[in-house]
């Protein structure tokens, strides 16, 4: 965190719109402050595009007057139901609201709102680091108002609430998710009383819509080190309420002196590994869900010990229900996550044995355009503390990647389509839709995958005719 003098703050607010806002506020005889995350991010040297202004008076009136003064190119949107307005000008967006005092009923996070002072408005902020305000009026331009020692908390890298955290979280339980999200994004510690209040109020999350919860959860998944957030969600008791499938991965069971690894912490390690490689949100979700089927597939076998057979397939089948319940997209993004969860054991199985062309070709056929992401996930999944074992897998993965590149250079297997279509089979043998069509297509597909025949239509058709004859099928024109 950097130190900012008032003169330096004036320089940081050099965009002409800030001075213009101050002049309009002076003309209208009201105080106006830029507040919240924008001010916080100035101190933390983080990019911030959200500019929020609080007016001790009518935020809508100031926004409308500002729009008139800015003239052509300025666009003002008014949201009277919320008492807010937005001004867009030269690529900059500023939100205006009047200073407010809020109170809540226990069964709702919708506040009862009254006009208030700047102090009232800062009192209702979620965290001290977001309760900062900088005056834009001409005589006090650049002056910081830090009512709750937010700067000190930033220096100490602490998330704390301005008022009693139990009231803060009970009034608006979404703030619990925001608390964990900020701690994750900023890598701050949650202050002790605030952390205890999270645990006491966790059940209150039930009144929050799933859409609001998943918005915060996605921000945790997208953070530089997402595991921070999931460890905290587990600690405070929110995780089993919002993501029970992930919570069930926690813990280690021992039998006859043999234990399995804690699949929750393994999953978080895989997620962090993926996060170091990519910002792809849905690849991160695939990492988060890659072992989600393990609790349902867990078995004890006297010789083998703990097993999780077919956990990848079981997990891929769980993805749809998880996405539907959590209000995640039920489109190609979900199918992408399903595919990676289902296939994530394939490269590991190949790397644990001899890396053959046919095995790599089959993998490439199944993964298609997502093969690189699948390999990234699988490499992240190697979290063994046995460095020799880990290095052996990584060396074999490198060989798999080399063979993938070689196969791709020879033939575009990523977008592979079976040279033999069902329509061609029906026309050749005069068939109506039947199971024999699928059998022949699969036989041709397997033959190409196993390098029995070349990946050409001519070879595939000849092979199809041969197999059809063995099945007792004859061409229609014979």
Locations of regions flagged by a protein language model:
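Catalytic cores of the polymerase beta-like nucleotidyltransferase superfamily
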Residues: 1-478
